[in-house]
């Protein structure tokens, strides 16, 4: 009965996009973790990806009337929302292109922007953080599915919730599908942390140019997306999309 239920909840597409594959998610998550460590450790303790910390610090400094410091956290927030808008514009404008997927355009734009960040000196940290936040927002808006499940490649809270939920369900039902789902999320979380660890170490060796390693990881994802593969799409993914990717 469980297998019959599972059959109804899973759809297979023979011409899937590698942008939704686990392999692509690996490189995006490594890059996402590296970006966050880069801006926090090297660019003035600003979170480029998860904006919750920036909102907290912005609010605190506004309350204390530290306007210069408040601006320090407001700029990446503004850049993030603009990045989401631009990614959506790219999707609507280039979704019907056949030669290249619109998500590849997002990745290529992100690579070029992050490459430029590597040339910015430390006295331009505010600009560097703005560009990284903008790029991150494009990525999180464009890549919201992994093997048919909703996920985020630049932050962990939604992935942790979904991974734990699936693990709890597996312990109750012993359904291997939910175990596979949970493991996918925990692997992505580990890879994000691994990327952050690499980024945090590399800044002491490569300085501003550490962000170029993120570019290299994204470039792998860019070329992977020329491949087509069969993917699964799960009905619960549609429910998750509303919550996970936006957290």
What are these model-predicted stretches?
Residues 2-247:
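Alpha-helical transmembrane segments of multi-pass membrane proteins
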């Amino acid at each position: 009965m469980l297998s019959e239920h599972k059959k109804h909840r899973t759809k297979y597409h023979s011409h899937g996009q590698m942008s939704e594959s686990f392999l692509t998610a690996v490189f995006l998550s490594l890059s996402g973790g590296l970006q966050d460590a880069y801006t926090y450790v090297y660019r003035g303790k600003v979170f480029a990806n998860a904006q919750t910390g920036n909102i907290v610090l912005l609010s605190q400094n506004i309350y204390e009337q530290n306007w210069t410091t408040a601006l320090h956290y407001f700029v990446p927030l503004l850049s993030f929302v603009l990045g989401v808008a631009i990614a959506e514009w790219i999707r609507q404008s280039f979704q019907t292109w056949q030669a290249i997927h619109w998500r590849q355009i997002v990745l290529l734009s992100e690579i070029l922007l992050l490459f430029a960040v590597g040339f910015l000196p430390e006295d331009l940290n505010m600009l560097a953080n703005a560009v990284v936040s903008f790029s991150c927002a494009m990525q999180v808006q464009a890549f919201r599915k992994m093997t048919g499940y909703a996920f985020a490649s630049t932050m962990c809270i939604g992935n942790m919730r979904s991974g734990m939920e699936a693990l709890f369900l597996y312990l109750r039902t012993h359904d291997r599908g939910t175990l596979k789902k949970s493991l996918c999320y925990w692997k992505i979380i580990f890879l994000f942390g691994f990327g952050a660890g690499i980024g945090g170490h590399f800044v002491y060796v490569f300085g501003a140019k550490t962000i170029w390693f993120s570019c290299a990881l994204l470039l792998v994802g860019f070329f992977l997306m020329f491949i087509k593969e069969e993917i699964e799409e799960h009905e619960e993914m549609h429910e998750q999309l509303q919550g996970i990717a936006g957290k």
